[in-house]
């Protein structure tokens, strides 16, 4: 018996086939994300059936037990795909019901940050911690929480949209129309904005040399500079880490986690980012000399965490 976990983002639909209790994919497949609900269902079904076919090529006894969907969207507790800024054209769509009707097995769905949170809690950097916050720094910011050993989803399934917490009242306008949200400053896009500001001020010439111009500088160029141990980049990462820590401090005050797991594409910045975030966070906590420190650790499961967690949650739902 296998489950298939999906990570459905704005660009790709990634599927992994898993055995119960294991984070190691038996097979993987990927396809393009479509912006029509019915076509998206077709894509998910095609990937799922392809994975089962791949497994049956060597073992014809393989049976699909359940499917888990981790989606970069507002997914409500009834499996309705409500809204996703990166998947335009799909609103209030009964995604779980439609996929279940096509595949004939139990189907669950959650936000992709929530499923990645569960993967890290169950198999990764959060093992052994009943109170954990997961912060994924990518194009935006996704978060998820384990409280008392269980995922915290909130009343309607929408808990974890922390990237939209207001950090600066009346601050710069985000693509969502909100002003001064955390992810404007502390995401991959935020790192690019900060790097361009530094370069324009003559503080990051090495990034200009890589990108060709100030305007062309992106977060990926900063990754290259970190990998090359370029001395110009460490002060930039320290300032960026402070923006990350501001939002994390809010989570610490509200949730009191034992540990914060740092995931998403920006974990490629590695120890330089992690240590700077942890130091900045420690300095922002009231009464820090009289309470346990909250360690910040790097996620362990990489880009497949969302799909692995979705598969694990699908198995959990069939117990």
Feature locations, PLM:
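A short acidic/small-residue loop/turn micro-motif
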Residues: 31-34, 89, 159-161, 167
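General beta-strand structural signal in soluble alpha/beta enzymes
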Residues: 107-111
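Glycine-rich phosphate-binding loop of actin/hexokinase-like ATP-binding domains
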Residues: 127-189
């Amino acid at each position: 018996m296998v489950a298939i976990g999906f990570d459905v983002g704005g660009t790709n639909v990634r599927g992994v086939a898993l055995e119960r209790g294991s984070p190691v994919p038996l097979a993987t497949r990927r396809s393009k994300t479509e912006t029509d609900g019915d076509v998206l269902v077709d894509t998910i079904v095609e990937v799922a059936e392809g994975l089962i076919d791949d497994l049956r090529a060597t073992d014809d006894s393989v049976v699909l037990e359940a499917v888990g969907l981790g989606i970069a969207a507002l997914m409500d507790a009834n499996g309705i795909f409500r809204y996703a800024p990166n998947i335009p054209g799909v609103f209030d769509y009964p995604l779980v019901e439609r996929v279940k009707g096509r595949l004939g097995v139990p189907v669950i769905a959650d936000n992709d940050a929530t499923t990645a949170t569960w993967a890290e809690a169950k198999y990764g950097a959060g093992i052994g911690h009943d109170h954990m916050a997961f912060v994924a720094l990518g194009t935006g910011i996704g978060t998820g929480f384990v409280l008392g050993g269980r995922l915290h989803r909130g009343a309607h399934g929408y808990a974890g949209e922390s990237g939209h917490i207001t950090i600066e009242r009346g601050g710069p306008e985000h693509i969502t129309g909100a002003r001064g949200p955390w992810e404007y400053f502390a995401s991959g896009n935020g790192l690019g904005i900060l790097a361009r500001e530094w370069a324009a001020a003559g503080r990051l010439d090495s990034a200009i040399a890589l990108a060709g111009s100030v305007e062309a500088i992106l977060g990926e160029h900063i990754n290259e500079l970190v990998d090359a141990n370029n001395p110009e980049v460490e002060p930039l990462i320290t300032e960026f880490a402070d923006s990350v820590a501001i939002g994390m401090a809010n989570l610490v005050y509200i949730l009191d986690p034992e540990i914060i797991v740092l995931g998403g594409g920006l974990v490629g910045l590695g120890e330089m980012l992690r240590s700077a975030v942890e130091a900045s966070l420690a300095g922002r906590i009231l009464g820090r000399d009289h309470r346990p420190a909250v360690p910040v650790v790097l996620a362990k499961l990489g880009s497949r965490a969302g799909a692995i967690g979705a598969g694990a949650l699908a198995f959990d739902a069939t117990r």
